[in-house]
Amino acid sequence: GKFSVYNSLCAIAVTRHFQVPQETLKKTLAEVKVKGRIELVKVSDEFSLMIDYAHNAMSLKSILETLKEYNPHRLVCVFGCGGNRSKERRFEMGEVSGKLADFTIITSDNPRFEDPEAIIEDIKTGISKTDGKYISITDRKEAIRYAIEHGEPGDIIVLAGKGHEDY
């Protein structure tokens, strides 16, 4: 997305300052992958699934706007919000996904000491400000399984919030 472009431009500026050979820079930029950032995971020949660490409204908006530019059949967003964090963040993320995704699957994402269902209800409050379609599946593994099993040709499914984390 745009943040990756900005980060690459910063890297170019630093390498120029330190006189790193241009071929080294080209090779590195072509090969660099940041685990959990717009990470494509092959699960189907029919649709795309991406993992991204987007865990606030600004980063979720950025990744969804970027992926919409590819004109998917549907843009499906699977995400949750962490517990013991701002409720406002939950409302905002729900609203962003409701506006930009064609379908949202709300799930749990490290609830810490909070009830996962209460967190999901907060996210629903944000989505309810939009016309966005959604379901909630508390168990994250089940939510991901649902997204994959219901993927349609041309869809882009983004698993947002946890990036490379596996807990």
Language-model segments: residues:
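Nucleotide phosphate-binding/pyrophosphate-handling subdomain across enzymes
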Residues: G1-F103, T125
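C-terminal helical cap/extension that packs against the catalytic core
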Residues: G94-H150
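Generic enzyme active-site microenvironment
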Residues: M50, V78, T107, I137, ...
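A general secondary-structure junction signal
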Residues: K42, F79, R140, G161-G163
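Short glycine-rich anion-binding loops that position phosphate/pyrophosphate groups of nucleotides
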Residues: H55-N56, C81-N84, N110-P111, K162-Y167
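Residue-level signal for pocket-adjacent positions within structured domains
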Residues: K33-G36, I106, K162-E165
